[in-house]
Regions:
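Conserved alpha/beta catalytic core and glycan-binding cleft of carbohydrate-active enzymes
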Residues: 389-391, 406-559, 577-634, 638-649, ...
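Alpha-helical packing segments of well-folded alpha/beta enzyme cores
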Residues: 263, 308, 312, 373, ...
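Substrate-binding/active-site clefts of carbohydrate-active enzymes
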Residues: 211-212, 225-226, 231-249, 253-421
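An acidic- and aromatic-residue-enriched active-site/binding cleft used to recognize and process polar
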Residues: 145-147, 155-157, 193-195, 280-282, ...
Length: 770
């Protein structure tokens, strides 16, 4: 060892490198200028010899520590372009010095990260192939604040955690390193040395790809390497008002399809506006349908590459179909390479061990009190919406986030006020939804929540949580229970059918007959009474009733369904999208009106779906009895023509063909407390939908000259009569008047009561004074 090189050795730092405890390797290794030339140091465990090569010149390095620490002084006053040549037992490798390159993370990044506002963390965290200073490689970044040391390991360094320790940012606990030569497709992990000399190997929380089971290593991927063709769609999405548009969602898993093209063709043919995909993110267990998520930023290897998934989204957009992803910000799985105790300490999970594991699922719950965990989840949501152009997120198990005692009989810790609300989760959801809406106003944010949290879909500005929609679990449970009852007994459970209209406007709802609700078509049919033909009739009736009930729609009939059922669904979606009455006033009381809801003996309900235009009104008649009805009289909203535009019992849908092919003209026969009515055929276990065309007003009589003169003579009388004859009020005005009169009557009664009370009190006072 030369005396000059020896004099430049920082032995305590070299010892930290050799023992795998160095957190600032860029300050020790790599090149630096000295008065005696350029000092270059490197650590190559198991190496036999090492040299620095600059152009055609080779400088042998001196072994400073027998563990494999080498150094050399080369002449010059500027750092040259160089590479290492290292001889191992079986091979000699030439590679660039990772510590000759600076980092990407800045103090501004650190401050945003620590503040919980690092919404684009996905752009720098994880592994990103790039060119730095003209050299191709990959930049790695990970958060492990309590780690003694973090290294990147892979085939490129024989999975040796001593070889490439990462540089720790002083303020945040973020580690980063640019490694020349590492490229897309290379597998890697982080080796984390925790306190107590414990070595952990962890997958990258921000990794964009994984190896399949049983390895689950992270894989370097370039997710920006795709050319999109949906610029028009994305521009329209920013101004999309889903509350005034039809939303019919097809729920499915990519695992059900041989190819993405098949899914695109199916969804387009059936007329859906959106598809909702079970988690496409990586997950551990086959058969779990994607839950829980193990790699949040990676498309599952089961479904192909990131580029293939991007192509699927792009194709769906080009045929006018939006894409919603199931997303799980509530929990993550327990496995050695996952987020649990990532750096040897509770980092992503709740710190209280009693509250960290959910007893129902055995999964870990996120610590929403941590700004850095918020960064991880919010940037993940932004990642799917912005990088993969996804149009919405359906958030799973929101009730498990909102309630501290969800699924727990005991062993839970109340909040600071002694109640069961998870205050940190509430604030996280408000933060998440407000940021996503600010960045992408057209993104759909949907909650799956059954805990009856009030006003979940009201805005964050009103101090609520700010979802666009929530699943209507109450409607689904009540309706499926009603359908499971034999039609003969359904009259005893009629309220299960009508109850939902009492709360249909309390939230912005999506009605679901999804995979969780009914399973496959075979499983759905197994829940229903009757023979196979009756079961299929009730499946058609169920989808039809959902389509005409207030609320957006989501269904999961599966890919392999009978042709007739497919035609029925296609017809329903076509009708739904072309009928403003079925979606335009979903959130308004005036968009729905009962005609008859009390015919429980007959298992029949009748109602109207409306807009502000009478000619767009639809009349809906649902017969949940197993028998048809002939000449069934129904009250109608006005005189005019009524044409059956859909019947779930049509022969083309596999039904009996009990339809009304002729247009019905309303007659002035009172029914259902209405002046006009029609008589129709009702199919058993069927839904009929009628368009309503108001009748023309009667033509005015021709006025004669004599009549005109008479009217002029009696002008004063005519004006007097007109003044005394009030204009006919609309139904809406009449309702408002009645409500106003009722309120006035109630106030008057209350005033009279108060006066009587005061009078009695005065009388008592007078008697007492006497």
């Amino acid at each position: 060892m030369s005396k000059t090189v020896y004099d430049y050795m920082d032995w305590p730092e070299i010892e930290a490198v050799v023992y795998g405890e160095e957190t600032a390797p860029r300050d020790v290794m790599g090149p630096r200028l000295t008065p005696d030339g350029v000092l270059i140091q490197g650590f190559f465990p198991e190496a036999r010899a090492a040299a620095v090569v600059t152009g055609r010149t080779k400088y042998e390095m001196e072994l400073e520590d027998e563990a494999g620490y080498y150094a050399v002084l080369i002449p010059g006053r500027r750092i040259p372009d160089y590479e290492f040549q290292v001889e191992f037992e079986k091979e000699t490798k030439n590679f660039k010095d990772a510590y000759a390159f600076g980092g990407l993370l800045t103090e501004e990044d650190e401050r945003a990260f620590l503040g919980g506002v690092y919404y684009e963390a996905y752009k720098k965290m994880g592994a990103h192939p790039m060119v730095m200073n003209g050299v191709a490689g990959t930049h790695f970044a990970v958060w492990a604040p309590n780690a003694v040391r973090v290294s990147v390991v892979g085939e490129f360094n024989n999975w040796d955690g001593r070889a490439l320790p990462m540089h720790k940012m002083p303020m945040s606990g973020l580690f980063e390193l640019f490694i020349p030569g590492v490229k897309a497709g290379d597998a890697y992990r982080y080796e984390i040395k925790a306190k107590g000399d414990v070595l952990l190997q962890k997958a990258d929380p921000y990794g964009n790809r994984t190896q399949p089971a049983p390895l689950w290593n992270s894989v370097v991927a370039d997710v920006s390497d795709f050319t999109w063709n949906d610029s028009g769609w994305m521009a329209e999405r920013k101004k999309y008002d889903d509350r005034r548009q039809p939303v019919s969602i097809y729920e499915t898993s990519l695992g059900q399809w041989k190819s993405g093209k098949e899914l695109v063709a199916f969804a387009k043919e059936k007329g859906y506006t959106h598809v909702e995909l079970h988690p496409v993110m990586e997950f551990l267990e086959d058969g779990s349908d994607g839950y829980p998520t193990s790699a949040y930023f990676a498309v599952s290897t089961r479904y192909g590459t990131p580029a293939e998934f991007a192509a699927l989204v792009d194709e769906l957009h080009q045929v006018g179909i939006g894409v919603i992803l199931d997303w799980s910000p509530a929990q993550f799985p327990r496995y050695a390479g996952g987020l649990e105790k990532f750096d040897g300490t509770p980092l992503y999970e709740v710190k209280d061990p009693e509250m960290a594991v959910h007893p129902m699922w055995g999964t870990m719950l996120y610590n929403y009190d941590s700004p850095m965990v918020m960064d991880f989840l919010i940037s993940n949501a932004c990642f799917w919406l912005e990088v993969f152009h996804v149009d919405g997120l359906r958030m799973d198990d929101v009730d498990a986030m909102l309630y501290l005692d969800y699924g727990r009989k005991d062993g839970w810790t109340p909040n600071m006020y002694g109640s069961n609300e998870n205050l940190q989760a509430i604030e996280f959801l408000k933060h998440l939804n407000s940021i996503l809406k600010k960045r992408d106003p057209g993104a759909l944010l949907i909650a799956q929540e059954d805990g009856l949290w009030p006003e979940l879909t009201d805005s964050v500005e009103n101090d609520h949580i700010g979802f666009d929609y929530k699943w209507s679990g109450g409607w689904t449970r009540d309706f499926l229970f009603y359908l499971s009852v034999d039609p003969i007994l359904r009259k005893n459970y009629h309220d299960q059918l009508t109850l939902s209209t009492l709360y249909a406007y309390s939230e912005h709802y999506i009605l679901t007959l999804g995979s969780r609700d009914v399973g496959s078509l075979e499983e759905f049919m197994a829940k229903l009474p009757g023979d196979e033909k009756q079961k299929l009739a009730q499946v058609r009736e169920a989808y039809s009733y959902m389509m005409v009930h207030p609320g957006c729609k989501m269904m999961a009939p599966g890919a392999a369904i009978p042709e007739e059922l497919g035609k029925c669904i296609q017809a329903l979606n076509t009708l739904y999208k072309s009928s403003p009455a079925l979606y335009q006033m979903d959130d308004e009381y005036d968009g729905f009106e009962w005609v008859q809801l009390m015919k429980y003996e007959e298992n029949v309900i009748t109602f109207l779906r409306k807009t502000e235009k009478p000619e767009e009104t639809l009349l809906v008649i649902c017969n949940f009895a197993a028998i048809p009805y002939e000449n069934y009289q129904v009250g109608v909203p006005f005189a005019g023509k009524y044409k059956e535009i859909f019947n779930s019992d049509a022969a083309e849908f596999g039904g009996e063909g009990v339809v009304n092919s002729r247009v019905k003209t309303a007659k002035a026969e009172e029914c259902d407390e209405r002046e006009h009515s029609i008589k129709v055929k009702l199919p058993a276990l069927g839904v009929s939908i009628y368009s309503c065309t108001p009748g023309k007003a009667p033509a005015r009589k021709k006025v004669t000259a004599a009549k005109t003169a008479k009217d002029k003579t009696a002008g004063k009388l005519v004006r007097t009569v007109k003044a005394k004859t009030p204009a006919k009020k609309s139904v809406k005005e009449e309702k408002a008047t009645k409500v106003e009169e009722a309120v006035k009557a109630e106030k008057k009664a209350e005033t009279v009561k108060k006066r009587a009370t005061v009078k009695n009190d005065n009388n008592k006072a007078d008697r007492n004074s006497k």
